[in-house]
Amino acid sequence: PRFFGRSAIAQEYGAWDIEILAEINNAPRLTHDDIRREAERYRASGADVIDIGCTPGLAFPGLGDVVRELVDVGMRVSVDTFDVDEIRTAVRAGASVVLSVNRSNLDIANELSASEVRWVAVPDLGGPIETLEPTIAKLDEWGVSYLIDPILEPIGMGFMASLERYANARRRWPDAEMLMGIGNL
């Protein structure tokens, strides 16, 4: 509008809010100092939650220490793994969000339901959005806090279909909080 000599119209964004979750990928391959530096950099850049990305099949014996160190300096921490032992360790050390839960590891959410942790519910591996329904039903039954992540696919590898999944998830669960992992883009 300024180009045409007019003032800009104030944009109304609504009542929605977001949290920025920044993932430290392949954390088991990094030193504790590297993880801490990366977490500090992400927090300084505006991240609300620091996500410790575990590596499938690679043990992470220092996971509890890493989570505890970050929580002790005031960071909110999440853990990105399906491994129930890693989830248990991270939550006991103070992680407040777990990525991810589906029918393959759902029992751990019940086991840890007394904690304040929020779970990120995802479809079963390779499954359609309908596979979220039994997971969400159980989380609701157990009174567990969760977000829904229909999974965003990379451009050229199912991106448009994944956007349609997000729209479908919003229609199915209009009041649910959602997570959109844009790192795949």
Predicted regions and their residues:
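Catalytic domains of carbohydrate-active enzymes, especially glycoside hydrolases
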Residues: 37-56
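Catalytic alpha/beta core domains of metabolic enzymes, predominantly
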Residues: 115-185
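Alpha-helix-loop-beta-strand connector modules within alpha/beta enzyme cores
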Residues: 3-20, 57-89, 112-119, 164-180
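Residues at the C-terminal ends
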Residues: 37, 44-45, 72, 92, ...
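Catalytic beta/alpha-barrel core
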Residues: 1, 50-59, 74-83, 87, ...
